């Protein structure tokens, strides 16, 4: 460990591992350290022994749940958008050679006490039970505008300036009811809350197009998921880094960030060893004095022995409960997966519920999600702070990632990756097709 590196990375969360892989490919000498004995941090997938050690220390796991190795339990309910930024990064870096993906079978939204499939295009909107006949026509016209809008053709604008007109005013122009606005804004554009309504319409249109293009890629739903769990993602990028010379040290305590007299970080101490580097990346847990809390998340991991009710017995689903449907300020997300994803034994299913904490009783806030699951075999819940760095890292050369957030996908995470990459290198991350490993 007593060597000099270009970059030291602390923690093997997905943000850290993507950056480690990208910087290694760029020719940087990278040392990657994690205090845990497993990859992934908050993006990890744990076996049963690890799961019980984290949530119920000292308690033995039930033998009835089968072999440890048959379980890969995610800590967060996230899926990849099939046409999203993380998927593109995986393809361009050739990390897809290490990871096999399976499509999520259905995308649902909670409305008026029941769940229904989210329409992915104009034709599905016409068949949706979420809307009345006349509302379906209005929704179809709105989605046609989203799809047909062209910057170079004013005839497609429909008297809408997407950089000036708010999304609220656009919905009003098309005469869409509040319930329809809910599933478009929250189940298609995937917003956490209603702040987007007051903002210009461009971003919402782009988000709906991402949803639609992701569905168009494979059909059924816009989401894909790695076999053996989300923990495969950081491990895939760690392998990329290692192939390009990166050094990995798991189960390695980090005792101190070492700074020079000018306050700039120069290395990391573990015991009596010091590794030096020009730049340091890390998750918030390694920089407690340099981050602030911006909220809290409550999550529940539930083991079921049946599919989630009212989802056509599908092996995998996402369910979004829009805030207004349960008188909240933030949505509730449910990710459901099963043995076909190699994350649990046959006959079992996993459902993970998540939302942003709004009250003094966080567990009561996920109750609407729990009600949709039916009988639960085991459940594990916890509340976590959401952290973000207080500075951009350019002065002290400590580049800190944001906590894994409440969104149901990875688009915000890749925004953080791109932002940190630019601050560290001074250049935008440009995705160039990497040579295939066998070609090198």
Curated annotation (Swiss-Prot):
It holds the Pfam family GDI. InterPro entries: FAD/NAD-bd_sf (IPR036188), GDP_dissociation_inhibitor (IPR018203), RabGDI (IPR000806). One of its GO terms (biological process) is intracellular protein transport. The keyword DNA-binding does not apply. Keywords: Protein transport, Transport. The keyword Protein transport applies. Coiled coil: none annotated. GO terms for molecular function: Rab GDP-dissociation inhibitor activity. GO terms for cellular component: cell division site; cytoplasm; cytosol. It comes from the Eukaryota. Belongs to the Rab GDI family. This is Probable secretory pathway GDP dissociation inhibitor 1. It comes from Schizosaccharomyces pombe (strain 972 / ATCC 24843) (Fission yeast).
């Amino acid at each position: 460990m007593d060597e000099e590196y270009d970059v030291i990375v602390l923690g093997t969360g997905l943000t850290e591992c993507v950056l480690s892989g990208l910087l290694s490919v760029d020719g940087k000498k990278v040392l990657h350290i994690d205090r845990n004995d497993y990859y992934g941090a908050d993006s990890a997938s744990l076996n049963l022994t690890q799961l019980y050690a984290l949530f119920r220390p000292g308690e033995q796991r039930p033998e009835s749940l089968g072999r440890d190795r048959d379980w890969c339990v995610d800590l967060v309910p996230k899926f990849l958008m099939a046409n999203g930024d993380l998927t593109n990064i995986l393809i361009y870096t050739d990390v897809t050679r290490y990871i096999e993906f399976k499509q999520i079978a259905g995308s649902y939204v909670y409305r008026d006490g029941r769940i229904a499939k989210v329409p992915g295009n104009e034709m599905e909107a016409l068949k949706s039970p979420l809307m009345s006949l006349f509302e379906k026509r209005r929704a179809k016209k709105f989605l046609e505008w989203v799809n047909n809008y062209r910057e170079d053709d004013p005839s497609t604008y429909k008297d809408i300036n997407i950089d000036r007109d708010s999304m609220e005013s656009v919905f009003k122009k098309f005469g869409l009811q509040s319930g329809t606005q809910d599933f478009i804004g929250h189940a298609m554009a995937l917003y956490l809350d209603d702040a987007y309504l007051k903002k210009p319409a461009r971003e919402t249109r782009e988000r709906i197009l991402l949803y639609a293009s992701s569905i168009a890629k494979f059909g059924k739903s816009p989401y894909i998921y790695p076999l053996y769990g989300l923990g495969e993602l950081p491990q895939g990028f760690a392998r990329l880094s290692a192939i390009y010379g990166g050094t990995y040290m798991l189960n390695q305590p980090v005792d101190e960030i070492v700074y020079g007299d000018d306050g700039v970080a120069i290395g990391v101490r573990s015991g009596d060893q010091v590794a030096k580097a020009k730049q340091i990346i890390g998750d918030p847990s390694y920089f407690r004095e340099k981050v602030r809390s911006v909220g809290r998340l409550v999550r529940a991991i539930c083991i079921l022995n049946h599919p989630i009710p009212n989802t056509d017995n599908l092996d995998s689903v996402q369910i979004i409960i829009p805030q207004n449907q349960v008188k909240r300020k933030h949505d509730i997300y449910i990710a459901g997966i099963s043995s076909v994803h190699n994350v649990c034994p046959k006959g079992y299913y996993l459902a993970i519920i998540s939302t942003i904490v709004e009250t003094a009783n966080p567990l009561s806030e996920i109750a609407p999600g729990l009600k949709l699951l039916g009988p639960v075999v085991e459940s594990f819940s916890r509340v976590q702070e959401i952290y973000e760095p207080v500075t951009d890292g350019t002065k002290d050369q400590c580049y800190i990632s944001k906590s894994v957030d409440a969104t149901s996908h990875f688009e915000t995470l890749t925004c953080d990756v791109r932002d940190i990459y630019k601050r560290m290198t001074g250049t935008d991350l440009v995705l160039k097709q990497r040579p295939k490993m066998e070609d090198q």
